[in-house]
C-alpha cells in the first residue's frame, strides 16, 4: 500500500510498479470500439508512450498495445495506485498550498470506488464521464499539485496536465478544458477515435471538473422534480401511494431511489447491472430489491394499497417492466403507475448507456464490442418498444417526462413515435423536465449549489447544514415573493432531512438548491465559521454544471429558451471566463454532459473558502456573477420570471446593469411587415 507522499511523487519508473491488470470485484467500463486504422493504432501508442522515457517504452508498448486492442483504450492499468482511493482529510496531502490540497481531495473523491462507476477506468458516472484518460495523467496531476505555489496555475487539456504556468495569486490555480474540439468534428464517431488516440476526453459534468459528490449531487434536484411533477401533473402536494417508475441506479440515476423515499412515494427503478443495484442497496439508497417481475408488480400493488413509502429495485430491463404495466392495464383495467421517466445513459446508447431488452446484460456487453452494428440495431428496436409502452400508458392518467439524458432524442433517431405535431425541433411528445419544471426554477436563479468539508469530519458538515438552514429561514423572515418562498420552504425541508436520509457517499458534502442571495449568504456564513474555528478546515464551494448559467443544452438546461438561442453556447463560455476573472480557485469548460458529446457546452468551478476576508470577497463577487449571468440570458430570451428576478437584483446592486428586452406589443406588426 503506497502513501499519499509516494502518490504525489510523479510517475514511478525505477522500478516500475507491478502490473496487476484489471481488478476483480469492481465494475469495469464496457469495451470501446474506436475502429482505428493500423496507422491510428500506432499514433495512439506513440501518444501514450510520450509520458515515459525510452528505457521503459519497449515493455510498456506491449502492454499498452494489448489494452488498446482488448479494451479499445489505453488506461495504463499498471499505474493504477495501490493506495485506497478516497477523499482524505485536507491536512494529509503533501502540498504547498491549501488550494492544491483541496483539489486533490476532490479528485480522489471522484475516483473512490464507493463513488465512481468504473474506478479503474477513471469513470465517475454516466458510463463514460472521465476524470482522466489514463493513470499517468492522474499521477502527474497529483505531482504538479503537490509542487504548486500561489503564483502558478495548472493547465489541463482533456485530462492531460500541460504543466504549471506562472500566474498571479488571484488567478485560478487550475484551469480545465475537456473535449474542446472543432465543431465540425464533434460527432460521436470522431469522439471514439479521438479518445482512443488519447487527445480528448468526455468529462461529463462534475467528473472532469473534480466536483462530483456522489449520487447526492442529483438527489435534491430529483426530489424537486418529482415533488413539482406531483403538483403540476397530479395536482397534489402529498405523493403517498403514488407510483413513480423509472430506470437506472448508477452514479447519477441512483438518486432516484433516495428521492422517492424522501418525497414519500413508491419508486420502482429498473437496473440491468446487478453490481450497481447491489451497491445502492448496500449503501442504504434502495430499500428492497427483486429480480422477479411478478414479485415486483405484486409488491408495487401492495405498497400502493397501503400507501407505503418504498424504493424498489427491479433487477431487469425497464422495457420489460413498462410492457408488464401495459399488460396489467389491458387485462385488468388497472393503471399501476402515475409518474414516469428514464435515466439510462442514453447520451451514450451504443456503448453501455442503454441495454436492449432482447439481450441479457452479459450478452449485450459482448455484442456491443463484437458486432457494434447489430447492437445498434437492437438498441433502436428496444427504444421503439420502450416508447410504445409509455405511449399506451399515457393514454390514461399517467405522466412521463424526459430527464435530459437524450432518451427522447435517441428514441426519435430510432424511429419511435415521439413526435409532437406542430412543435419545433426541441420539443417532443413528452416534455423535458426543464421545460415543465426545472426551467422556471433556474429562471428564478435557483440551482444545485454545493459544498464539501475538506476536513472529512461529519461534524463540520452538520455545522454547515445548521448555517444554511438559518440563512434560508432569515431570508423568509426578511420577506420574499411567494414563488421564491415556495423554493425556500422546499429547500429548508431538504436540508433539515438531509442527515436523516444518510446522503453522504464519499466526501462530507451537501447539495442545496439556492438562488444568488442564498448562495452568497451561505458562503459568507461558512467562511466566518471557518475563521472562528467552528469549522475545522477549508470548505470547497461548487455546483453541478446543470445550473442556471453553467450549461447550454437545447435538449435539457436551455430547452425552455424559445428565442432561437438555445443552440448557442455564449452563456456557458462566458460563465467559465467570468468565474475565472472573479475569484474561482478552479474552472472547467466541457463539450458534452448529460445529453451527450456534441449536444452540450457546460462548465463549472471550485472555490475554496479558508476563513479569510479575501475568500469572502471572492465568494460575493463570483457567486453573484455565476447566477446573474444565466438569469440575465433567460430574461433576454423572454422568460418573465427571469425578468422579474434580474430587475430585483439590479435594484439591490447598483453595479449591475442588464440590457432588458421589450416585448412586441402588437403581433400583427410582424405579420404586416413580412407580408409579400
From Swiss-Prot:
The EC number(s) this enzyme carries: 4.2.1.49
Pathway the protein contributes to: Amino-acid degradation; L-histidine degradation into L-glutamate; N-formimidoyl-L-glutamate from L-histidine: step 2/3
Modified residue annotations for N6-succinyllysine: 534
Pfam families registered for this protein in UniProt: Urocanase, Urocanase_C, Urocanase_N
EC top class named in words: lyase
UniProt keywords, alphabetically: Histidine metabolism, Lyase, NAD
The protein, known as: Urocanate hydratase
Organism for this UniProt entry: Mus musculus
Phylogenetic lineage: Eukaryota, Metazoa, Chordata, Craniata, Vertebrata
